[in-house]
Amino acid sequence: MSDAVTDADGSSAQSHAQSAGHHAVQGHGGHSQGPLLKLAVGAIGVVFGDIGTSPLYALRDTFAGHHKLPLDLLHIYGIISLMFWSMMIIVTFKYVSVIMRADNKGEGGSLALLALINQHTDGKRWGRGIILLGVFATALFYGDSMITPAVSVMGAIEGVAVYRPDMHPLIVPLVVGILIGLFFIQSRGTEKVAAFFGPIMLVYFGTIAVLGALSIAEYPPVIAALSPHHAVTMFIADPWRGFLAMGAAVLAVTGAEALYADMGHFGRSPIRMSWLVFVLPALVLNYLGQASLLIRNPAALESPFYYLAPEWFQWPLLFIASCAAVIASQAVISGAFSVTQQAIQLGFIPRMTIKHTSTAAGQIFIPVINWALMIAVILLVLVFQRSSNLTAAYGIAVTGAMLIDNFLLAVVLFKLWQWKAPAAIAMLAVFFAIDAAYLGANMTKIPDGGWVPLVMGIAIFTLLTTWSRGRALMRENMAEGTIPLDVFTKSAHSSAARVSGTAIFMASTAAGVPSALLHNIKHNKVLHERVVILTVSIEDVPYVDEGERYSVKDFGNGFYRLTLRFGFLEETDVPGALKGVSMCGEPFNMMKTSFFLSRQTLIPSDKPGMALWREKLFAWMLRNAASAMEFFRLPTNRVVELGSQLKI
């Protein structure tokens, strides 16, 4: 694990983490304000969009997808049983009951979990393996972020062709138009419309529950499909096709990790309550209703979700489902912004321009991510054309991330919670068996589109690990021959002229003299009255207490070493943090303070460390990283950049 980044940005990343979950658009700490019911409604609007829109295509694709099952009672009952118990074991037990207990100062999500784990595994030989798994899950998350908006919106809009077959040629243009509009409004922020997400999703879940219940009433015996023995019977009678069908059945639990990822925004109790009391029953009723419809009318397989509606309600259902799909897509896009911000802080991704669309924490817009996602999503729609084709690509990213979560959970159980081995192993064995089976079933869909998230994942994993490794090599090379600060201050105090004001030199580590200071002495031959060597440290916690915000060491003669600490969910507002520093001489006056940054130009070489092509890739990423001045919110007219060359 690294403990710093480079002089170029002066920050120190003390942990690396990953994410495979979605993050909400709400601010941190929301669960401490307002009544439980209000927070539960908010959670329904953000957390459950992905899993909530699964009924649009999950059951249909089990019987009409790439690995079709016979449409008979054995397989209908078996799949409904499999979906129900998957939701109970994976979502309700694994995520809601177990993983949601593993919070990092109230924050959830795999990034927060990995940062928490790092505190207990730093320096361990196997710790790096856990980190790499986490990084790969982050890469899979980005693949998921590309597929979810495409499959959700397309799955909803395909209802147009169900009711009006002559409008089928308009589906792809409609989907592309909606998605382009969705990505274009991101820069304006979604705070004003976000207040409607909860009520709209309440209407959606209420609607699918009622439609499902009405269909169940037409064939009440379908309720028996909830018994686990029907899934077992199906696998015994038809093991191979049952296994292949798991590739589509897993669609019923996509988005499960969002419950954990958004815990910091809404709190554990509101999410649990909304899932157990409202969302889960609505999903179960709808899946049972679709099963009842297929038993009574096999021709409804074209779209059992939409054929549940009576004729007079068909277009209203299409509108409600389309709104739900857009909301689900919005939650994923906001999650991609949130994960990227955390990954930047934790040292996995180069600095990017981050724009705040609201005063509320978490309301951010990252242009590079937004436009990259938009291009990828539209390409997926144009290439795959139908949601049933896209679902083949969907499952691998989801099941891969879920399997990796088991490894992270294992560390939590043994290292953090100190569980006894028999209980931990028994529970983990169940989780690993289920997730591995689902992943194996989805691997059979690689030729049908499953290769898409794998290729995306490997490409993004390469970028993330190249950046992380490149920064580590830079730190190692810069540390070679570093002059101790106490030695430097004794000689510099007597040999350089002093000028009025304060100079802050951004440093990557809390040891040695930063290259910007050495270059300033070499070229300008002066020192300011007060010289502060500043390191920004990103901690393994989401938020740092104000009492632990900074530490100062006074070297005398106007020399100070200052460390500012930020959590991985906080903005690195250096001028704002400096206002609270009281042990570094007189208070900081930004108009009398100059910030000195060092900008390295990398020269790829044949030195050991990374392959030459990765060194060139890293150099390109570094050149295109956002300005440290902007990232740390430094006043533009008070910054001096000094260049240097560095071989890696």
UniProtKB/Swiss-Prot annotation:
- Can you say where in the cell this protein is located? Cell inner membrane
List all membrane-crossing ranges: 39-59, 73-93, 130-150, 165-185, 193-213, 243-263, 275-295, 317-337, 364-384, 394-414, 421-441, 446-466
Q: Which domain of life is it from?
A: Bacteria
Membrane topology label:
Multi-pass membrane protein
> Keywords of this protein's UniProt record, alphabetized?
Cell inner membrane, Cell membrane, Ion transport, Membrane, Potassium, Potassium transport, Symport, Transmembrane, Transmembrane helix, Transport
GO MF assignments: potassium ion transmembrane transporter activity; symporter activity
Stated family: Belongs to the HAK/KUP transporter (TC 2.A.72) family.
User: What organism is listed for this UniProt entry?
Assistant: Novosphingobium aromaticivorans (strain ATCC 700278 / DSM 12444 / CCUG 56034 / CIP 105152 / NBRC 16084 / F199)
Describe the task this protein carries out: Transport of potassium into the cell. Likely operates as a K(+):H(+) symporter.
Annotated region Disordered: where?
1-31
A GO CC term? plasma membrane
What the entry lists under Pfam families is as follows:
K_trans, K_trans_C
Major location category of this protein: membrane
What InterPro entries has UniProt attached to this entry? K+_transporter, K_trans_C, K_trans_N, Kup
Is Transport one of the keywords?
A: yes
Name this polypeptide is given: Probable potassium transport system protein Kup 1
Q: Where is the composition biased (Low complexity)?
A: 10-26
- Catalysed reactions, as listed in the record: K(+)(in) + H(+)(in) = K(+)(out) + H(+)(out)
